[in-house]
Amino acid sequence: QSLWYHYDFASAPVKLSVLAMNLGQEGGDAETRESDTQYMQTVGTYVQFTPASWNLSGSFYYQTGKNVSARKVSAFMGSVRASYSINDSWTVNVGTDYLSGSKKSDATYRAFNPLYGTHHKFYGTMDYFYASDFVNGYAPGLSDTQIGVGYKVSSSVSMGLNYHYFATGVKLESLNRTLGSELDYQLDWKIMKDVSLSVGYSLMRGTSTMDVVKGGNHKSWQDWGWVSLNVNPTLFKK
């Protein structure tokens, strides 16, 4: 069950959203073949403030209840972002996201679960985090600090470059918290009405901590490039 409320303030450039969600997940005992349902609740808010050339936003969400393994949950996430339009062409932005993590020794599960979030939109376009699971029983959370710049070449062409610094949300055993850095570049071209082209390239430089919690070999070259042709026709119009 979900409850969502959104309000646009008439007297100020402020938008406010509130979310409350109750999620039931079925689990059980493989030996007795008995099933049960564990319930976890997520509550939080998102606020956006857009005075003049600024775009400021922040969010906070808290999770409680029990996860599918029947462990008590107490987790949270927070996000703060700011962007500024220097002129009609240039934009700069900074931001930070923090998702709490859990140690293996924790009796209470403290790793925040983004659930149905649009993972590709956040935490870098290479999708190292949350679009794929952590390994070896780790749930370290995530800290993502980013800075970027956008440039509008013309009315139909724009590009952006963003840098991400990733770290675990909690300190794990003898591991360093730093996971690595990612650089994302994207160019968007509106070719004609209903047709656009997007091109991107990303580069990740990981650490030995990344190898432990995500697998792989951080010493190998890690990058990807992509091209997307988007066709969005209007089929029905009054």
Question: For each of these PLM feature ranges, what is it?
Answer:
Residues 3-7, 45-49, 80-84, 94, ...:
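Residues on the lipid-exposed face of transmembrane beta-strands in outer-membrane beta-barrel proteins
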Residues 1, 37-43, 52, 72-78, ...:
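Residues that define the transmembrane beta-barrel architecture of outer-membrane proteins
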Residues 11-18, 53-57, 89-92, 155-161, ...:
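Repeated loop/turn-to-beta-strand initiation elements of outer-membrane beta-barrel proteins
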Residues 55, 59, 63, 68-152, ...:
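Extracellular/periplasmic loop regions
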Residues 1-58:
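Internal metal/ion-chelating core segments
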Residues 27-38, 68-77, 104-113, 170-178, ...:
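Outer-membrane beta-barrel translocator domains and adjoining extracellular loop/strand segments
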Residues 9, 20-26, 51-53, 60-66, ...:
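Transmembrane beta-strands of outer-membrane beta-barrel pores
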Residues 220-238:
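Outer-membrane beta-barrel "beta-signal"
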